[in-house]
Amino acid sequence: MTSPAKFKKDKEIIAEYDTQVKEIRAQLTEQMKCLDQQCELRVQLLQDLQDFFRKKAEIEMDYSRNLEKLAERFLAKTRSTKDQQFKKDQNVLSPVNCWNLLLNQVKRESRDHTTLSDIYLNNIIPRFVQVSEDSGRLFKKSKEVGQQLQDDLMKVLNELYSVMKTYHMYNADSISAQSKLKEAEKQEEKQIGKSVKQEDRQTPRSPDSTANVRIEEKHVRRSSVKKIEKMKEKRQAKYTENKLKAIKARNEYLLALEATNASVFKYYIHDLSDIIDQCCDLGYHASLNRALRTFLSAELNLEQSKHEGLDAIENAVENLDATSDKQRLMEMYNNVFCPPMKFEFQPHMGDMASQLCAQQPVQSELVQRRQQLQSRLSTLKIENEEVKKTMEATLQTIQDIVTVEDFDVSDCFQYSNSMESVKSTVSETFMSKPSIAKRRANQQETEQFYFTKMKEYLEGRNLITKLQAKHDLLQKTLGESQRTDCSLARRSSTVRKQDSSQAIPLVVESCIRFISRHGLRHEGVFRVSGSQVEVNDIKNAFERGEDPLAGDQNDHDMDSIAGVLKLYFRGLEHPLFPKDIFHDLIACVTMDNLQERAVHIRKVLLVLPKPTLIIMRYLFAFLNHLSQFSEENMMDPYNLAICFGPSLMSVPEGHDQVSCQAHVNELIKTIIIQHENIFPNPRELEGPIYSRGGSMEDYCDSTHGETISAEDSTQDVTAEHHTSDDECEPIEAIAKFDYVGRTARELSFKKGASLLLYQRASDDWWEGRHNGIDGLIPHQYIVVQDTEDGVVERSSPKSEIEVMSEPPEEKVTARTGASCPSGGHVADIYLANINKQRKRPESGSIRKAFRSDSHGLGSSLTDSSSPGVGASCRPSSQPIMSQNLPKEGPDKCSISGHGSLNSISRHSSLKNRMDSPQIRKTATAGRSKSFNNHRPMDPEVIAQDIEATMNSALNELQELERQSSAKHTPDVVLDTLEPLKTSPVVAPTSEPSSPLHTQLLKDPEPAFQRSASTAGDIACAFRPVKSVKMAAPVKPPATRPKPTVFPKTNATSPGVNSSASPQSTDKSCTV
């Protein structure tokens, strides 16, 4: 049996239970204390919030009062000034407007902070008081509920204690009865054993005596056994009874124990959480959230109100405008700034002569004085113009200084954890930088220089004004027909144009023609002032009836040409826009809808004479064309209107010049943009029109061009017929590369796209269609197809007629070496083409020449494996044939001459002949013989053939030169024959390479350069080929073709001697 010492005694069990209960009771007490402490913290927090917002309300109120005092202090000064009377009409200067808005913002902030203080006191603080009262009341009720739950829990624990003691008592009685029962059983066993032993020890003496003894002993044993059995039975019954009671008590104890554990778990896990959440915190956080959101709403609305005021101030700062302020100032003090009445002649003592006397003997003196004034004025104007340019440059420097963007102080408001870093950031402001002193010194020095130049300019202008007035009066008095003033020169020019019945005056047509050819991309055209000396020279030439801008010369300053055009319109005696329609036109500007504005402007302008409308239509079409290049020339319609507004439409006297000029500029801008909708079309109003794509044809037909012979006239008529035929039959082309148009006129397409070509618009462009849209197509990005020989070119009309009138050329034969599969006798083909070029008669008139590109003679003579040949080189004014001629070799021949042949064959006259049906067949036949009949030849024989053919061609060319009575044309053979003997050896290759991939050596001598007349006339010199690479994969052109520019064909470059070769119009290729 197990020793009883190993089991806990009742006292130990009771002591442990009591200790556990005491711990629970102490924990419950601490829970109440913790909740009490939490309630006190909430009350204290709410009290602190009330005190905080009460103090903040006081601060906001004080801040509001201070802001109001600040605003009233300065508003009182503003009310006392005269500017206040204009405030109702909003007729205040922009800085004053900023100042007024700043004061209004201060007053607005004052009102907002007063409102904020009132919200703190009457809204937010009462909310916190209410939350505090509700929290305390709810906590008391929550504490009562918690105390009741704790009492119930302690009651359960006491019940468990009672059940446990009952279980211990019954279990002890059961154990005691069990021990007694076991003791009775032991006695019974002991008694039975004792009886057996006594019977064994006794020996019987006589039968009678033995029987008596046995009877007595049996009687004694029976009585003792019965007693033991009765005692055993009693103890057995007692044990059974006590055992049953112990089992029942244990069951009750286990049930009570489980219930107690469940109650404890429920209290700690559920009841406490419910008491805190649903009793103590009931509505506390929600009420606090509402109160704080009220604070946030007030602050955010305050911030929004402040931002609205700051936005108004920012808008006023953006509208700071010196011009508008000047206009308002003059309007406010109109009596002060209006010009005084003119001084009238006051006769003395009855002298009524109020005009200059130009009779003898003072006439000669007046003439001499006028000449002196004229000379003096020319000098002064030039000097004053230079001073003006210097002054404007200095003014721009000052504006750059004062407009530097150094106002961003966002770095000073970066978040920082320490106040020291904030202070260091704030200390490094703009005003504390060391460079501010130097900057201020530079600014003051620049300002001093500017005012010096301004004073000098104004003094010079005053002197010019006085001398000009005297000169004009003398000029008027003397009655001379010619004046040096630009305005009178333009009037005389206008009279001559009207007398000659010309719709567009010469000066207008010539200047626009020159600018449209050479100056569409000139930056600042019409804005930058030109040279006064050159302006006077051009003006004098027009006065004499000459056209100084005729031909293809480009040695004039573009700004000077633009200045001449502006001065012409400025000096018209009868301006294009008469003053009697000034108010009607200005009224149209007030319309917001651009289309309606154009309609009304059209109605006003239709009352003008037809000659004036024709000139307007021509001029504004040109200005619209010019504005389309604004990305390069920086002259959009608005900038052009600023430059042309004062010249075309002057503000009548009695009107404010500043305010009216802005409306004039807007009017001119509208006419430039909507010129097609404003002016009548050619059907409604007959007369010349400005043509963008083919304007040179109009120039060629001008009466100011050179005389056109009857032969040329016949050719022109026939050329027009052929051109129309070409336009009626579109040509199909395939795109070689992807192209993205840079303007609305240029078409975009993908590689392999099918294109329809109508006609050649220029050297680099076709007019065609793609996906139903008409526009310009770059020639270098397409492959033109034809049904006859796969290649077609649209040449100029003149060249086609010349080809028809010439007999077919002799077929060219060539011999090739076995080692040169793609090479022919280059010299034969070259000389044959030179003969064609020499036989072309020159014309004295200005013609429009279109260049054929890579599908001319050069491409027909080269291998089809290199499609880029002849498509990417520019002919020079001094070709060097010796660098491209083949040199004999023992086992190989050079084909570098193909590049030279291709370049020369691209001359407009030569390639146009090759495009005609007769010559095309001849070229095809010659090509088949020279390139397909490959017979092995000795290199020495080839060299001898070249020399013999060259000598023969030289004799023929010299004979033609002697017979020709036209102007000498530079002889290509004579110019290139001598370099032929000393030309460097060019490494041959098996096939020609595209000029796009050809590397060029540096010229030993600089090539003749043409003046920068136009992008289409730029030429580069032929250079020796350094190395000819193998045929590379076809790539897009190195540079995009430039927009359409129409070059001339009869001009020579300045500075080129008579031996230079004719300029080619080829510009499609870049090396």
From Swiss-Prot:
* Segments forming domain Rho-GAP: 489-679
Going by the UniProt record, its keywords in alphabetical order are: Cell membrane, Cell projection, Coiled coil, Cytoplasm, Cytoplasmic vesicle, GTPase activation, Membrane, Methylation, Neurogenesis, Nucleus, Phosphoprotein, Postsynaptic cell membrane, SH3 domain, Synapse
Per the record, which residues fall in region Disordered?
181-211, 703-726, 794-820, 835-936, 983-1012, 1029-1071
Q: Which domain of life is it from?
A: Eukaryota
N-terminal signal peptide: none
Q: Do the record's keywords include Transmembrane helix?
A: no
Enumerate the InterPro entries for this protein.
AH/BAR_dom_sf, F_BAR, FCH_dom, Rho_GTPase_activation_prot, RhoGAP_dom, SH3-like_dom_sf, SH3_domain, SLIT-ROBO_RhoGAP
User: Which BP terms does GO give this entry?
Assistant: actin filament severing; dendritic spine development; excitatory synapse assembly; extension of a leading process involved in cell motility in cerebral cortex radial glia guided migration; filopodium assembly; inhibitory synapse assembly; lamellipodium assembly involved in ameboidal cell migration; negative regulation of cell migration
Q: What is its main location?
A: membrane
For the site labelled Arginine finger, the residues are: R527
Q: Which Pfam families match?
A: FCH (PF00611), RhoGAP (PF00620), SH3_1 (PF00018)
Tell me which residues bear Phosphoserine. S206, S427, S500, S691, S695, S724, S795, S916, S930, S990, S994, S1013, S1027
Localized where?
A: Cell membrane; Cell projection, Dendritic spine; Postsynaptic density; Postsynaptic cell membrane
**Composition bias type Polar residues, residue spans:** 857-867, 874-885, 897-907, 919-933, 1047-1071
Q: Which SUPFAM superfamilies match?
A: BAR/IMD domain-like (SSF103657), GTPase activation domain, GAP (SSF48350), SH3-domain (SSF50044)
List each copy of the SH3 domain by range: 728-787
Residues bearing PTM Symmetric dimethylarginine: R927
Which intervals of the chain form a coiled coil? 363-401, 940-968
PROSITE patterns in the cross-refs: F_BAR, RHOGAP, SH3
Per the record, its GO cellular-component terms are: cytoplasm; cytosol; dendritic spine; dendritic spine head; glutamatergic synapse; lamellipodium; nucleus; phagocytic vesicle
Query: What does the annotation say about its assembly with partners?
Result: Homodimer. Forms a heterooligomer with SRGAP1 and SRGAP3 through its F-BAR domain. Interacts (via SH3 domain) with GPHN. Interacts (via SH3 domain) with FMNL1 (activated by RAC1); regulates the actin filament severing activity of FMNL1 and actin dynamics. Interacts (via SH3 domain) with FMNL3. Interacts with RAC1; specifically stimulates RAC1 GTPase activity. Interacts (via F-BAR domain) with HOMER1. Interacts with ROBO1 and ROBO2. Interacts with FASLG. Interacts with PRMT5.
- Free-text note on domains in this protein's UniProt record: The F-BAR domain mediates oligomerization, binds membranes, and induces plasma membrane protrusions.
Name of the featured protein? SLIT-ROBO Rho GTPase-activating protein 2
> Per the UniProt entry, what species is this protein from, by scientific name?
Rattus norvegicus
Its taxonomic path starts at:
Eukaryota, Metazoa, Chordata, Craniata, Vertebrata
